[in-house]
């Protein structure tokens, strides 16, 4: 796309794009002016040939791809045909653009035939040189191809469909072979300019016949070399819009038919009626269920007498009625008692247990336990009544101990009046207690003798605690 940006409004060209042609720029040939009458004659002849080409193109399209390939191979096999003699400057232009003769011949077969007429519309009797013609051809390539496609559209409907597929694939071909197509167009323009410059050479019937062969082959194999970004008034764009509009119209009609089927008011009415009918059926069904629910209690009440009328083989009917009345009375009594509030005393009363008789051994154990408890209580009272000693010396402690030991021995030997518990003791117990007391007296005597050695004792003044 950038190579077309060098074109200015007045037709001048930046020749940096054609750096590959600098070596041969000295071989430019001057352009000779041609009279308007010759140009008009050429244009009228070309228009007639275009009409013939359109008629023959219709027949060529109906023939298969096989016929076109055969014609193309036959054309290549005859390099010395009159068409090549009439288009003599083409090899020079092809050599100038850096292409071989075979490549030039292949691209010439794809050039549309409406180019001279388009040149008359855009260039009033102005014939530039070879470089200018190639640049103008690159600049005006889109309208030329568009005009040829319009001619093909008028000729046949099948060619339109083939041409649409060719246009869709031409954009990709243009991206790959942009520079090559520009060179081939320059070669074709130079050859066409040489034909129009020479007054002696006029288009003969053989050249027109060869052009018809080219047109027949190029109708279905035309290559679109237009730039990707084209103006909004492009004829090819309008052709594409026309082709797509027909498809859209057909699809819109189909969609309209579908939408009419979907949004048909009769269909909506049927749907509404069906919904109302379903609601009515549901309402009736609910009413029937409610009616059955009302009938069920009455049917249960009616079944009870039937059950009473049935004969009971165990009891008579009168006995059965009496039993049922008694059951009802008991049930009411139980419910009334359950309904009463509970008594204030929630704690249950202790049951009065009958006195149990014990064995003699158990009675003896209880009596012995009671005696031990009584002695313990007496000792506890004695200990509570005792005051602490005055001195803390060893002798004072020993004296206090002797006093206590004498008290214990005296109580063990002389029973208290009014109590015969000591005399009633068993011999084992009494002997055990006596042995303990005797050992205690012996210890007291030893301590007393040791204390007598330390200091003199006042035996006459000592008296027992209970005296």
From Swiss-Prot:
The keyword Ribosomal protein does not apply. The keyword Cell division does not apply. Residues 124-135 have a biased composition (Acidic residues). InterPro entries: Cfap97/Hemingway, Hmw/CFAP97. Residues 180-194, 421-439 have a biased composition (Low complexity). Residues 162-177, 223-235 have a biased composition (Polar residues). Keywords: Coiled coil. Residues 1-20, 76-235, 336-370, 412-467 are annotated as: Disordered. Residues 198-216 have a biased composition (Basic and acidic residues). It comes from the Eukaryota. Signal peptide: none annotated. Residues 310-387 form a coiled coil. Pfam families: Hmw_CFAP97. Belongs to the CFAP97 family. PANTHER family: CILIA- AND FLAGELLA-ASSOCIATED PROTEIN 97, CILIA- AND FLAGELLA-ASSOCIATED PROTEIN 97-RELATED. This is Cilia- and flagella-associated protein 97. It comes from Xenopus tropicalis. The lineage of its organism: Eukaryota, Metazoa, Chordata, Craniata, Vertebrata.
């Amino acid at each position: 796309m950038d190579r077309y940006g060098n074109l200015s409004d007045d037709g001048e060209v930046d020749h940096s794009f054609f750096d590959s042609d600098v070596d041969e720029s000295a071989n430019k040939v001057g352009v000779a002016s041609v009279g308007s009458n010759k140009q008009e004659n050429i244009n009228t002849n070309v228009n007639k040939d275009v009409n013939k080409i359109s008629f023959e193109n219709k027949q060529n399209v109906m023939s298969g791809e096989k016929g076109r390939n055969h014609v193309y191979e036959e054309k290549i096999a005859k390099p010395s045909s009159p068409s090549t003699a009439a288009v003599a400057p083409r090899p020079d232009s092809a050599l100038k653009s850096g292409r071989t003769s075979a490549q030039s011949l292949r691209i010439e077969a794809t050039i549309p035939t409406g180019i001279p007429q388009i040149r008359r519309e855009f260039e009033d009797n102005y014939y530039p040189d070879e470089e200018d013609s190639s640049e103008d051809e690159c600049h005006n390539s889109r309208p030329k191809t568009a005009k040829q496609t319009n001619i093909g559209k008028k000729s046949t409907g099948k060619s339109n469909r083939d041409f649409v597929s060719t246009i869709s694939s031409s954009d990709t071909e243009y991206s790959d072979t942009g520079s090559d197509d520009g060179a081939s167009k320059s070669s074709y323009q130079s050859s066409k300019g040489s034909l129009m410059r020479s007054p002696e050479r006029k288009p003969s019937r053989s050249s027109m016949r060869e052009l018809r062969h080219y047109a027949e082959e190029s109708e279905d194999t035309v290559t679109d070399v237009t730039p990707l970004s084209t103006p909004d008034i492009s004829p090819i764009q309008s052709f594409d819009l026309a082709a797509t509009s027909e498809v859209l119209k057909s699809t819109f009609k189909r969609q309209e038919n579908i939408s009419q089927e979907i949004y048909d008011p009769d269909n909506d009415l049927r749907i509404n009626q069906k919904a109302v009918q379903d609601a009515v059926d549901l309402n009736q069904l609910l009413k029937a269920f409610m009616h059955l629910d009302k009938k069920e209690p009455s049917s249960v009440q009616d079944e009870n007498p039937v059950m009473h009328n049935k004969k009971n083989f165990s009891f008579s009917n009168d006995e059965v009625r009496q039993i049922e009345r008694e059951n009802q009375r008991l049930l009411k009594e139980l419910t009334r008692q359950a309904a009463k509030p509970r008594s204030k005393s929630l704690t249950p009363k202790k049951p009065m247990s009958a006195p149990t008789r014990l064995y003699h051994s158990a009675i003896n154990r209880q009596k012995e336990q009671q005696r031990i408890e009584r002695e313990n209580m007496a000792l506890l009272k004695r200990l509570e009544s005792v005051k602490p000693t005055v001195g803390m010396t060893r002798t004072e402690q020993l004296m206090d101990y002797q006093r206590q030991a004498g008290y214990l021995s005296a109580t063990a030997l002389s029973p208290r009046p009014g109590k015969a518990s000591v005399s009633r003791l068993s011999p084992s117990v009494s002997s055990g207690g006596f042995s303990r007391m005797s050992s205690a007296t012996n210890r007291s005597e030893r301590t007393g003798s040791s204390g007598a050695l330390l200091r003199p004792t006042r035996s006459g003044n000592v008296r027992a605690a209970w005296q």
